């Protein structure tokens, strides 16, 4: 059991290490602010199964996203992380708007196993649950479209550690 657990943890870390690479390849749909898109991609897991939850994201992007991590917490809790001290963003060393969660949260990582370019509803994902820390990038809210109760909002899931 120990070798299997160790191997699966290593595999998860390797998959999550690619998160920053995959995240840089997409563009926010125009109907969303960056905070709304963050919430859609990383908080609002519409189903307990990756195959179904990823359909929401894939429909907006019109492609099978290679991987995605859903934090099993609330948007308000992630907003609170934005109040933690600023750190350099691991995925972009020129940015200093990242914040470490300070506590581990349950999460579900979805990794594309079966792409389906012709029919994105047929994309299939492996699902890996874990409890991990996260690093999130935060920016000032969009004053026209984000709710005023959060002046600073999460805009990018930078790293899972």
Curated annotation (Swiss-Prot):
Cellular localization per UniProt: Lysosome; Cytoplasmic granule
Signal peptide start and end residues: 1-27
GO cellular component, one term: lysosome
Residues at which substrate binds: 65-69
Chief location of this protein within or outside the cell: other
Active site residues of this protein: 42, 156
Superkingdom of source: Eukaryota
Record keywords: Disulfide bond, Endonuclease, Glycoprotein, Hydrolase, Lyase, Lysosome, Nuclease, Signal
Disulfide topology: 50-110, 64-123, 82-138, 89-98
Enzyme Commission no: 4.6.1.18
Keyword Glycoprotein: yes
Known glycosylation sites: 34, 44, 86, 92, 111, 119
Single biological process term from Gene Ontology: defense response to virus
A single MF term (Gene Ontology): RNA nuclease activity
Transmembrane segments: none
The keyword Nuclease is assigned to this record: yes
The reaction(s) this protein catalyses: an [RNA] containing cytidine + H2O = an [RNA]-3'-cytidine-3'-phosphate + a 5'-hydroxy-ribonucleotide-3'-[RNA]; an [RNA] containing uridine + H2O = an [RNA]-3'-uridine-3'-phosphate + a 5'-hydroxy-ribonucleotide-3'-[RNA]
Described function: This is a non-secretory ribonuclease. It is a pyrimidine specific nuclease with a slight preference for U. Cytotoxin and helminthotoxin. Possesses a wide variety of biological activities.
Subunit structure: Interacts with and forms a tight 1:1 complex with RNH1. Dimerization of two such complexes may occur.
Family per similarity comment: Belongs to the pancreatic ribonuclease family.
Name of the protein described by the UniProt record: Non-secretory ribonuclease
Organism: Pongo pygmaeus (Bornean orangutan)
Taxonomic lineage: Eukaryota, Metazoa, Chordata, Craniata, Vertebrata
Gene giving rise to this polypeptide: RNASE2
């Amino acid at each position: 059991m120990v070798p299997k657990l160790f191997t699966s943890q290593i595999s998860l870390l390797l998959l999550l290490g690619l998160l920053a690479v995959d995240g840089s390849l997409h563009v926010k749909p125009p109907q969303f602010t960056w905070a709304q898109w963050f919430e859609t991609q990383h908080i609002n897991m519409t189903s307990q199964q990756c195959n179904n939850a990823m359909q929401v994201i894939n429909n907006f992007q019109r492609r099978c996203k290679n991987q995605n991590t859903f934090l099993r917490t609330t948007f308000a809790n992630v907003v609170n992380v934005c109040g933690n001290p600023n750190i350099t963003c691991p995925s972009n060393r020129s940015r200093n708007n990242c914040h470490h969660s300070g506590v581990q949260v349950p999460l579900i990582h979805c990794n594309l196993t079966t792409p389906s370019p012709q029919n994105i509803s047929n994309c299939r994902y492996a699902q890996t649950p874990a409890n991990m820390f996260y690093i999130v990038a935060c920016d000032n809210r969009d004053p026209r479209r984000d709710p005023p109760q959060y002046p600073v909002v999460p805009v990018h899931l930078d790293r899972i550690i």
